[in-house]
Amino acid sequence: MKSFGSDHSKSGRDIGKKKGTSGNSTTNSKKNTESSLGGNTKVDSTSQSTSQGSSSGDSLSREERLARFRKSSSSVIGLDSMIEDRKEEGILKTNAVHMEAPFGKPIEEVYEGVHTGPVLGTGLSGLVRLVAHKATGVKYAVKCLDLGLIDTEEELARLREEICIMCKLDHPNIVRLEEVYESHNEIYLVQELCPGGELFDRLDEQPGYRYTEAECARLVKQMLSAVRYLHSKGIIHRDLKLENFLFSSKAKDSDLKMIDFGLSKHFRKGEVHHDAVGTPYTVAPEVIKGSYDERCDLWAIGVLTFLLLTGDAPFGGCGGPEPLTKVRDNILSATYAFEPADIWESVSESARSFISSLLVVDPRKRPTATEAQKLPWLTEWAEKSRSEADNAINPKVVKALVKFKELSDIRRLLCEVLSFTLLPEQIKDLRKEFEKMDIDGSGEISLWALKEVLLTNAAAGSLGTMSEQEVEDIFNAMRVKKTETRIHWHEFIAAALSQCKIDDRNLRLAFDRLDSDHKGYITLDDIMNLLGKDGLPREDVMREMWGDSMKEVNHETQTHITFEDFALLINKAQAQDSDMGLPTWFILSLHEWLDTFLPMDNDDNNNNTKQVMPCIMCSPTSLANIFPFHC
């Protein structure tokens, strides 16, 4: 298991004395230690975010190790075969993660600061740096893994597993993997940047080094949603801790993002795992014993809830004076107390009950993530914080969803790819709307939930009339892969794209994602490769839709789409919220401009009033004269 205490000097509630982290960090360094929690349970020294192993004194040279791993593949980790496998699967959220062909375009040509950018964190096998996309200026975190420090096939398999897992994840509270590059010496994982910093550091800033119960409940709710999502996809995290949750922004009400899947693993229901991994202060007793399943993640949530409410870890292990053997004994017997009294007397009984239900030694008696979401503490606080506005769906978003189903499959696909390029500030309003529809807290939207929300709002008169069939049509249009039973986070964003302020940065990033081999244009094959064989409509249908797209950009005989063509197609796809074909955000901006510059008239009472003029948005003819490119 990873050693936490070796790097962080923090005793009791002195959480503010944490050392060795950067303010904007996405990782923490951990010393290579042979400490143990007693018995034969060895501490895994793998680092939090570059968790792929350390040098073990192998007699092979660096070059010999890399050559051994490459074998028949040109890639150490088999990146080329992973690219081919994804084409078969047909999962857009997976294929949308760009994997540069081994030794293809160097990452240094795409990003500024790969080797010189500010270090956000360090680990045993590399660094995490802040970089900027050269063409757009968008900032990302790049995890640079030194392949020369990977000694065993097991460590290599763990790295492959991390990449495969991150490619499949699409949840508002889980960090997004954007791109993967490989050089002769390193693997680069380009990830969404979370400038809000670690939950560990944010806790350090709280009065008394602890959160209020209301804020703690908000954060735990997000953690559980991410854990439930992982488990529903057959993934166990195995290293949940404060450092592995980042805030997406510096705002006080910022959402959490789960990170670091270096120890994560796929599992089958009922499967038992035996390798001892994790962090001493959050590790579950069954992990120490060497026989566990996905419910070890729920134990960690119980520990984190306790810690957020008090600043203390219930069993020690947070760099305090207690030896790891004592921490081990406390965990194995679930020995902890709701102390000191001056803190816990202000904490509700339902919060204590929530923690107690998770910190149960027998994992079979521990609730699942879904069951934990329904425990009274979370439901009570959710009800207290809910307002009427939390139930009302924005009619403009619903209108966007209705219009989305009228687009062709290719148009919808382009919107989906574009959705992965949006920054947090561009989708913060959609995040709220998504949460209203995610009524079961799964991080996805079921057909039942969509019907419940839309039909209830329609009945209340806020959406006009709407039938069950219309809701089903909306649901089916949002699903990229028709065998899926739920709508994913970015599928929702794609459908409501017209509510976002799209700019040239997004268009360029999306175009480059489609033009994965850097031709300078997009072909039908690029589209088909992105969808994969299993995700494709019939090929003749795709070719017909492609031909229609060509007509829309006035290229009936052309076989490819340039960046300018792509921008025009996206503009038309987004133009769905007004009869003139202009997106809502543009109309609102235009109204604001008119409000600023319209001349003033004086009425009989000498009060300044705006001159009454016809709105150009009500006059398609005048609009065509102003914006001829749109018609």
Go through each PLM region and give its residues.
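Activation-segment/catalytic-loop signature of the eukaryotic protein kinase fold
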Residues: V180
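Conserved N-lobe beta3->alphaC-helix segment of eukaryotic protein kinase catalytic domains
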Residues: C144-L169
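Amphipathic regulatory helices of Ca2+-sensor modules
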Residues: C415, E444-S462, I487-Q499, T523-L536, ...
